[in-house]
Amino acid sequence: MGKETQTPKKGIARLLEIAAIKKPLVITSAVLSALASVASFIPYIAIYNIISQILAAYPSFSALDTAYLIRLGWLTLDGILLNIALYFAALICSHLAAFGTLYKLKVDFASHLARVPLGFHIMIGSGKLRKIMDENIEKIEGFIAHQLPDIVASLVAPIVMLAILMVVDWRLGLAALVGIAVAIVIQVRAYGNDGAKKMMDEYQNALEDMNNAAVEYVRGITVVKAFGQSVYSLRRMYDAIKAYTKMVIPYTLSWENYMSAFTTIVNNIYLFLVPVGILIAATTGDYAGFASRFIFYLIFVPSIATVLMKIMYVTSNGMQISGGVERMDEILAEPE
């Protein structure tokens, strides 16, 4: 029985496979990033308790337990410092892993290029190879060093955030979740369709063609200047620039509505809370308790925007880097 052919991994799965070259450092970075994400919510819990204590004692502030409030204040500061320390440690580990991975990938890629037939270099073009070596592989370093800890944080943060939203007051939590759901639907429509993937592939192809043409143009610049020619004389360079322009402008404009809608919603989730808050206030018998919870949600929902924006940027960068990795793998798959 022959061995089964293993399907090559693509996308995030392939990026994680590459990151596994320095597995211990990557795992350590992921754990520290997850802990940092949890620690980032400690100040919100402490502030909620401070607000609750103050409103419960109103108007007799002399009854406040000042020692307890001071401890909560220190807990807020400790949460901030712990988040910074853990995230800094996570970045140190991820950068060490990234530099080691980058070195290995570049050495392997250069060694492979030295062994492939000469005709392959003529067919592909040095501009495309230079882009893969200098840009695509460099972006993998950026993914491991920065995006990977952010991916872990963007997975852990929504879980902690959801728990807080539902535990403090499930009614206000559901109102906030409606806003989050609308934002996620917009994000999925923007990233999670075949059109977005196809457009990203076309963008990468146009960029590589322009790189190839630019390298050839620079190499032939002495001849061009000697005979008083312009860029129009090098038809391939001119066509590559026009093709890139024709592709990148619609690509940019395609994000006009999605990005505007997503940014507007994630930065104004509190608007979903206000109507629900008015309805609850009209029927509640514990105004102090409700006021403390409502104020907490108004303070807390801006953190939702931070989490969702981080998820959006991680997704966007992941698509670009994945496309670059696929091109690197295509070169590495060439027979020597």
Identify the meaning behind each predicted range.
Residues M1-S40, F61, A67-L72, A90, ...:
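Membrane-integrated ABC transporters
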Residues L16-P24, L118, E135-I144, L148, ...:
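An intracellular "coupling" helix at the cytosolic face of ABC transporter transmembrane type-1 domains
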Residues V26-L86, M166-R171, G285-A291:
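Transmembrane helix-loop-helix hairpins at lipid-water interfaces of multipass membrane proteins
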Residues P43-I47, G79-S126, R130, D134, ...:
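Juxtamembrane helix-loop junctions of ABC transporter transmembrane domains
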Residues H95-S111, V152-A153, A176-T222, Q229, ...:
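Cytoplasmic coupling helices
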